[in-house]
Amino acid sequence: IQDFNKAQDVEAFVNQNSEMPYNGDFVFKSALPSESANQIFNLEEGGTYGPYKEGDFWKYSKVTGVKQIPDSVKVRKILVSYQGTPVDQGDMTRTQEQAEALADSLVGVVKNDAGKFAELAGEYTDDPRYKDQGGDMGWNRYTNARLMPEVKEFVYNNEEGSIEVIENQLGYHIVMVEEVTNMQKAVQ
């Protein structure tokens, strides 16, 4: 326990010394085990609690971060993909360089006029699920968001109106945080 308290790299320490892998997600109080939720949730950053039994495991928890995050976010997205990505069905002609240039151009337009997002999504997105909705991905609750990790990281850590290009294995996602609701404390 003393080694854990002194560990500079908590993730590496947990992964090396625990049967359960490190989980770096921020969680709301409702996601913590009811028997220990109050004790853990009231800790300051760096604070520890335990050991305590949860199911078949003995646990010792350390709060490595505390912040306010929204319970839900409303998101719009334009996916600009290119040859060789999982989105490519063999008919994609755009190169990665062309996709990056198009994404940079589109993000410039929507940062100047967010009202054009839906129109541009309908014209340019390579994600057929949201093409007819103008890129509208609807409301996503933090606890069960169906977002790719890179997109989830952006939308839950930025304010309403934030727009950014996020690159991953599918291509370039132009993501806009339309609305956020119910900011609340979360611990890591």
Where are these regions (language model features)?
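Soluble sensory domains of the PAS superfamily and closely related sensory modules
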Residues: I40-E44, F154-E159
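Short coil/turn helix-boundary motifs
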Residues: F4-Q8, V110-A114, N158
